Amino acid sequence: MQETTISILGAGAWGASLANLAIANGNRVRVWSRRGSETLSAVLQGADIVLSAISMKGVREVASQIQSLTPSPETIFVTATKGLEPETIYTPSQIWQSCFPHHPVVVLSGPNLSKEIDQSLPAATVVASRVATAAATVQLAFSSSRFRVYTNPDPVGVELGGTLKNVIAIASGVCDGLHLGTNAKAALVTRGLTEMVRIGNCWGAKTETFYGLSGLGDLLATCNSPLSRNYQVGYQLAGGETLAQILAKLPGTAEGVNTCQVLVQLARQQNIVIPITEQVYRLLQGEVTPQQALDELMLRDIKPEYN
């Protein structure tokens, strides 16, 4: 098999995990980070695949820098970032596609806690693109006996699954922090998935995608793991800490904090009912306590499960 050259942008926990997976498969891998010594131009030289694992706030800046470097027309761009751009409500793949309209863009997302992947524990993920051959190329580059990669033709749904679940993960952390029990956790995750589908449908995503690895799978992993930064935000809020205190000591970025604000803005514009997300937003803003948020959710008007 011909060696594939992969440039990984971002040397955080997720970027490093993906780099190790690619190296283990015999690919030629270069890693770029803001704090590293190598230039972006050098890291991108001859890249077949450019994979972005940088935080949401840096996506557009880095994509714009790469534009000026004129990458090869055959280069495949892969985004493994989860979040939304507040100013435009763009997803990471939409930013990459707007900067490189003639290149294939692939979304990589799934229930992938980097610490477990680094321990070689088995995991699965999804790569999605409107260009099937591009998704298949990325699938081949990363699939192994410990990391199973599926393809999917719905990049919007796959990307939103990984993005939207971060907000529900904050709520899940609150649930566990308040010791509300298994019944409450099951209700929260299930109704949270309903909100994810509502928002995703508004974006044009397919409902069935949210019941796959990148939706329900990622939701279950993130809502049940103390390794998740978003979960930790909720858990510590339930313990009485302020958001500022939590973020100051949090290793890495909890994308759900910013995503929540963008989602509430969108939902109010489009009249989408997302009560859990609304209460997470109010909690993050300091408008309600965790207990008050719970009470407001439980005392909403009763209604059918599906409508």
UniProtKB/Swiss-Prot annotation:
Signal peptide (from-to): none
Entry's Gene Ontology BP terms: carbohydrate metabolic process; glycerol-3-phosphate biosynthetic process; glycerol-3-phosphate catabolic process; glycerophospholipid metabolic process; phospholipid biosynthetic process
Compartments, as annotated in UniProt: Cytoplasm
Reactions listed under catalytic activity: sn-glycerol 3-phosphate + NAD(+) = dihydroxyacetone phosphate + NADH + H(+); sn-glycerol 3-phosphate + NADP(+) = dihydroxyacetone phosphate + NADPH + H(+)
Chief location: cytoplasm
Catalytic site positions: 165
PROSITE patterns membership: NAD_G3PDH
Key words of the record: Cytoplasm, Lipid biosynthesis, Lipid metabolism, NAD, NADP, Nucleotide-binding, Oxidoreductase, Phospholipid biosynthesis, Phospholipid metabolism
Domain of life where this protein originates: Bacteria
E.C. number: 1.1.1.94
Entry-linked HAMAP family: NAD_Glyc3P_dehydrog (MF_00394)
Protein known as: Glycerol-3-phosphate dehydrogenase [NAD(P)+]
Gene that encodes it: gpsA
